[in-house]
Amino acid sequence: SDIIVGYNTYIALVKDLIKDKEVVGNGMRQEVDRCQKAVDLSAEGHQVAVISSGDPGVYGMAGLVLELIQKLPKEARPECEVIPGLTAANTSAAALGAPLMHDYAVISLSDLMTPWEQIKNRAKLAAEGDFVIAIYNPKSRGRATYLDEIRDIVLQYRKPETPVGIVRKAGRPGMNWTISTLEKLPEEHVDMQSTVIIGKSTTFVADGKMITPRGYKA
């Protein structure tokens, strides 16, 4: 690529790889402008890379870029390759042990584009179905109570001692984690840089590792 497009914070994380390439960066909540710029530059013949954190197809920019490309006349649409990455749920799971070994659901608590009632319903159905639940965007200043509300919903279907893993800055410098329980979750430090993994009915903790059995006869 000769042009790098992305959220300023993510561009800073890969600055050592960019070298002398042209950079187009902007801030939070400017995703459409950012991706439209990338599509426009690509349509002009440039090789453009759009930077996402984690995996671009999991709450990243891959979907939006592909949607915007579809708005162009077919003959003007640039080729687009999605490069897979390592999403926070998987990075966090590796730090915690093996909590995602069975079926799991990934739910973002950000209600910028999804109604809060719909998010709560998804959490309810995931808990009722006994999925391990990986939670993205668990808390912010404007959403201080959302995680507690989700916890209360899950407690209708899980025991209070259900293991819960909390990983902060997954895959980044300063990454740290702790293993707690559903009952004690409100006491733990959780912020926007955290990923929360709530175990299922069979999840357990051994030697400091959070483990969800797959069902093998060991």
Predicted regions and their residues:
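Structural motif
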Residues: D2-I3, K21-V23, H46-V50, E79-E81, ...
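Class I S-adenosyl-L-methionine
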Residues: S1-C80, P186
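A contiguous loop/helix-start segment that scaffolds small-molecule binding in enzyme catalytic cores
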Residues: V48, E128-A218
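Short, well-ordered secondary-structure micro-motifs
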Residues: L17, M61-A62, S92-A94, E117-I119, ...
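Class I SAM-dependent methyltransferase SAM-binding "motif I" and its flanking Rossmann-like core
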Residues: V58-G129, K200
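Short, active-site-adjacent cap segments at secondary-structure transitions
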Residues: I11-V14, G57-Y59, A89, G171-G174, ...
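Short, surface-exposed amphipathic charged segments that create phosphate/polyanion-binding patches used
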Residues: K37-A43, A94-A98, K120-A123, W177-E183
